[in-house]
Regions:
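A generic structural motif
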Residues: 99-105, 138
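Conserved catalytic cores of phosphodiester-cleaving nucleases, focusing on short active-site segments
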Residues: 83-85, 93-101
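Active-site-adjacent loop/helix micro-motif of nuclease/hydrolase catalytic cores
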Residues: 103-111, 143
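N-terminal, charge-rich interaction modules
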Residues: 1-64
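Arginine/glycine-rich "motif VI" loop of SF2 helicases in the C-terminal RecA-like domain
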Residues: 118-126, 156
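Domain-level recognition of nuclease-like catalytic cores that cleave nucleotide substrates
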Residues: 2-16, 132-178
């Protein structure tokens, strides 16, 4: 099942209300929704940590298995990333995060697929970023068409960027665009 109420869910979370009829049972989707100093997602020793220096309200959504719950309504082979950070500060920002083993090329497809699926939802954000955390050394794929196209799309369409990092990455909210 693909959540069609993500926009409504974000607005309700920011006002401490609950969505009237969540099709995905949002307890499975939302991992964090508050102003904590550090918001992290991790799996199999790979970790992304957002340092919330501005104490903005941050909502951490589990995309794969939460916002997009695999069932017969989800197209077979549909690519989606692992997590979505929604930062509600001076400007609304979003970070799509993929925690990946070694197949970096596939992780780029997963972020691309999620961007495509939620294109209209993303129009409300000043910046949208892509983060890939890999378990092996970061391969030199910056010349690959998939990397170039996704990086260009994030930069030109969403005023964001793409970063690929090995194992663990801690990033300040004030340094996302660097």
């Amino acid at each position: 099942m693909i959540c069609t109420k993500l926009d409504e869910c974000v607005k309700n979370e920011l006002t401490n209300q609950h969505i009237a009829s969540c099709t995905n049972s949002n307890a499975q989707c939302i991992e964090v929704s508050d102003r904590r100093s550090y918001v992290k997602c991790e799996e199999r020793k790979k970790r992304y940590v957002l340092e919330n220096t501005q104490k903005s309200h941050v909502i951490l959504y589990k995309v794969d298995g939460g916002v997009v719950l695999q069932d017969k309504t989800v197209p077979q082979g549909m690519c989606r990333c692992d997590y979505l950070f929604v930062i509600h500060g001076e400007m609304a920002e979003a970070i799509f995060t993929e925690l990946k083993g070694v197949d970096v090329a596939h992780s780029l497809k997963q972020i691309e697929g999620t961007l495509t699926q939620y294109k209209s939802f993303l129009s409300q954000f000043a910046h949208v970023y892509g983060r890939v955390i890999v378990s092996s050394s970061t391969p030199d794929i910056k010349a690959s068409p998939a990397y170039v196209n996704l990086s260009r799309k994030l930069r030109n369409t969403y005023k964001g960027n793409l970063k690929i990092v090995k194992m663990q990455f801690t990033e300040k909210d004030t340094e996302l665009s660097m």
